[in-house]
């Protein structure tokens, strides 16, 4: 599955994990602060244009856009399933309109 994420400055991609899906992100434009939690260890990285990072299943992650006007991130994942996103803030899963999808046929 391929997704393109458009985030404005200081916008937060909320803290979540996936039980099955592995994600690889490519920073196409801008800069982000990536926060990972794996086995109770917190890791913070600053990533810029051209950087990549892979998140394995079970790793809690979030990122915040640190550049103005924002950032563009390409996501490649093993598959796409709304039911495999588990947000730390449980109210996010209740919002059925939390994402905008565009299909290109």
For the regions a language model picked out, list residue spans one by one.
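A short glycine-rich, His/Asp/Glu-containing loop-to-beta-strand
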Residues: 1-15, 21, 76
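Double-stranded beta-helix
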Residues: 64-105
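Tight coil/turn sites that cap or link beta-strands
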Residues: 8-12, 50-52, 56-58, 68
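Short acidic-glycine-tyrosine-enriched beta hairpin
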Residues: 38-61
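Glycine- and acidic-residue-biased ligand/ion/polar-headgroup-sensing regions
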Residues: 19-38
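Structural motif
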Residues: 31-33, 52, 60, 70-72
């Amino acid at each position: 599955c391929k997704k393109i994420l458009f985030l404005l400055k200081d916008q937060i991609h909320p803290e979540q994990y996936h039980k099955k899906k592995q994600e690889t992100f490519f920073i196409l434009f801008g800069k982000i602060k990536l926060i990972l939690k794996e086995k109770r260890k917190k890791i913070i990285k600053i990533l810029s244009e051209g950087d990549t990072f892979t998140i394995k299943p079970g790793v809690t992650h979030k990122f915040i856009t640190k550049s103005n006007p924002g950032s563009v991130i390409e996501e490649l994942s093993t598959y796409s399933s709304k039911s495999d996103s588990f947000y730390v803030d449980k109210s996010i899963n209740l919002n059925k309109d939390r994402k905008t999808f565009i299909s290109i046929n």
